[in-house]
């Protein structure tokens, strides 16, 4: 029996399409014949419906997954205010505990063939006074997929984030170019530069280029991602 796969999705910034790309990956894995589940372990920004607190990002992931996890497993830490998680957690009296998330991830792996873990904000967003999301990725011990919001400044953000991932001893399984600014000048040249540098310095391939979509259509975006190559990388990276 093949061991379950998993990956950690991070981004060059907040609001650059991590949830959108994570949903596209889930659709892609499902088309690849895999049972795909999502974890959004820390979500900041909740709304109440029918007496239940929910999160829009988590809702989008559930809609894309073909294995839907119980809310308390999918998102063990749901914070109400839409702000930096460590700030909101302190205000709401919540301790963002990595061990709890690792336990949820372990359970999720028993229910699916592949588990997509979406971070919050960028790679070094704090969780508390001493730990950040990079520490969570290390604790999970899974490869990372980097979502690059293609806009002015993205080259520097992408290379810095890739360096931070490597500094934690994690494998960068690949990156996705997500066009968030349709008016950006020289997008092709920017992507070509990132493709060359990330391949040379980190061996990280470009998994796909997603054009600006309004409204976002993760099911369509899934067809633009090299899921087969990513699955092979994830399998090779297994201990």
From Swiss-Prot:
Q: Major location, coarse class?
A: cytoplasm
- In which residues is ATP bound? 15-20, 57, 118-121, 178-179
Q: Which cofactors, by name?
A: Mg(2+)
CDD domains noted in UniProt: DTBS (cd03109)
List the active site: 40
Q: Name one GO cellular component term.
A: cytosol
GO-annotated molecular function: ATP binding; dethiobiotin synthase activity; magnesium ion binding
GO annotation, biological process: biotin biosynthetic process
Instruction: List the coiled-coil residues.
Output: none
UniProt EC number: 6.3.3.3
Q: Where in the cell is it found?
A: Cytoplasm
What's the superkingdom here? Bacteria
Its catalytic activity?
(7R,8S)-7,8-diammoniononanoate + CO2 + ATP = (4R,5S)-dethiobiotin + ADP + phosphate + 3 H(+)
Q: Which HAMAP family match?
A: BioD
Extract the NCBIfam families matched here.
Answer: bioD
Q: What does this protein do?
A: Catalyzes a mechanistically unusual reaction, the ATP-dependent insertion of CO2 between the N7 and N8 nitrogen atoms of 7,8-diaminopelargonic acid (DAPA, also called 7,8-diammoniononanoate) to form a ureido ring.
Q: What name goes with this protein?
A: ATP-dependent dethiobiotin synthetase BioD
